[in-house]
């Protein structure tokens, strides 16, 4: 991606040993054109479409609610730490994940440094601390070969972002300096990474 296709890394997620768990890469002056993350694969996590303003995302939520189709909302609306984008994740009728996003940042300056997030910092997934649903790490769309047959899934054998720490699936209160337990009101229907 870097040498042959001319991509540059905008942001990545690493641990103290330098293990890369994910990287956001771009060719245009936006945060990313593609992102590579770890997990079982090959799979497509989601496809994203940009919109102009946050109110467009709220309007989508309102329309889904009015149509009694709000179950299509998987996650959000919210704001990512990585990319700073305002987002909404939906599931289409076939179960594929679709992101509608806006307001990431301009990356046209070639001297911009790579923004590196610690894998233990859960604000990387959601700036506001909203939990990430377990399906975020578990589900992805099947990749087909050139004949239209599903490509067999290969289980990940190296370090997994989800397995790195309880809470790597987006929960707050998992930074090393945070010693208190997650508040009871935040536990509910969401599961920690070790409970999936």
Which residues does each PLM region occupy?
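Core segments of cupin and vicinal oxygen chelate
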Residues: 1-31, 195
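Vicinal oxygen chelate
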Residues: 2, 48-98, 102-196
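Conserved acetyl-CoA binding element of GNAT-fold acetyltransferases
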Residues: 23, 45-46
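Solvent-exposed, charged amphipathic helical/linker segments at domain boundaries
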Residues: 33-36, 44
């Amino acid at each position: 991606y870097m040498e042959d296709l001319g991509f540059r890394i905008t942001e990545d997620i690493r641990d103290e040993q330098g293990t890369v768990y994910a990287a956001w890469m771009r060719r245009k002056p936006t945060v990313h054109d593609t992102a590579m993350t770890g997990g079982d694969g090959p799979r497509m996590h989601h496809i994203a479409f940009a919109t102009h303003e946050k109110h467009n995302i709220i309007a989508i939520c309102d329309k889904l609610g009015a149509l009694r189709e709000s179950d299509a909302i998987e996650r959000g609306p919210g704001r990512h730490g990585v990319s700073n984008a305002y987002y909404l994740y939906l599931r289409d009728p076939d179960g594929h994940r679709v992101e509608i996003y806006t307001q990431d940042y301009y990356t046209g300056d070639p001297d911009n440094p790579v923004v590196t997030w610690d894998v233990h910092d859960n604000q990387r997934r959601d700036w506001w601390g909203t939990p990430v649903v377990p399906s975020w790490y578990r589900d992805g769309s099947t990749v087909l070969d050139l004949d239209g047959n599903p490509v067999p899934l290969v289980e990940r054998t190296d370090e997994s972002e989800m397995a790195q720490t309880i809470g790597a699936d987006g929960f707050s209160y998992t930074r090393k300096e945070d010693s208190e337990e997650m508040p009871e009101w935040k536990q509910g229907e969401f599961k920690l990474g070790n409970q999936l």
